[in-house]
Amino acid sequence: LYKKSRTLVISIFMVCIILLGGNHSTVSASALQANSEAPLLTYKGSHGVEIRSYVPGYDLDKLKEIYAEFAKNTIGEEIAYLSHINLYPDYPRGTNNVGMWHGEWFRDQIAPGRYIDLFGVGDDNPYVLNTLSHEYGHHFLYYYLNKKEGITNNYLNSEYAKIRNLDHYTEIDNGDHCWSAVEIAAEDYVQLFGSPDLTRIRSYQYTPQENAHLPLAWEVPGLYDYFVNLSGLKGKKDRDAPSMPLLQLTEVTPDGLFFQWDETTDDSGEPLIYSMVGVTHPTEDSTVKYLMSITKENNCYKSSLSRRQLREDRIEDILVKLIVMDQSGNAVSNNIQIDLSRPEDYFFLMPSPVLYLK
């Protein structure tokens, strides 16, 4: 049983977002009861997977819409082992747990009849499609890693782990959800093989993966080719990420940190999506994210962080990330990790690889 314990929140510019780690033990009786009751409505799509809705007010058109969006993810023979997708309006395992893929093994092979639970489903929840893509990523990877490499549970023994350089990080599988190897792999599926429509979700634009301290999937040499060779599938039609821009810290004042970068290019010729975010870990069980406003002057983009806000929040160092995403959801980033006691040291510094902040 594998679960995704992430809270996603949309915020206005320069507002702090707190993402609490861990899983709540509070259980909602209504959702548990729904497990043993007939769904309010069902719809079986073209792949044979059934959407089972326990959400009041959802009609057949809504279920068809969710299935159509689900089908935009990269899907192969592994779909035959997925039976259904449950939609629940509440959070039986706490609000940090928004989805689960239910795995089971028979004679060291994935068993048929697997299913996905989605929690907190409703018209006011924009994250359902992102969660569904992530949970299907679990299904996808468990199937192919087992079929091609004989892997059941220990992803660190896989070729994937080698290409992703997971052995370079002491935090891997330390109990923190974002450092779980299986969760990192599912996030990679979303980025490389997920639905291009995820770009419509604002939180996906600035958080294409849960772990902000690892390179994005498109930044890892050979990772896309590995997914292709593992599954025999090619993913999205657009299989190129944007060019990586140069992020620079250009000015430090008592009031703020000021950044800029030049407009970058993409093979599609379509407009790119730029996001700036500051990430830090003030305590071991929480993450603070600062969404930063962006302005454009000619071909130059600018953004800033309020030093007063950082002081009020007692932030000592921060990872500033520029994320550039094309219209298919392919993303790259540049990052500057700044010690706020001496930010002037980072003027015009070449962006460094992402590092884990403690």
What are these regions (language model features)?
Residues 53-109:
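Auxiliary, metal-adjacent structural segments of Zn-dependent hydrolase domains
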Residues 136-154, 197:
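Catalytic Zn2+-binding segment of zinc metalloproteases
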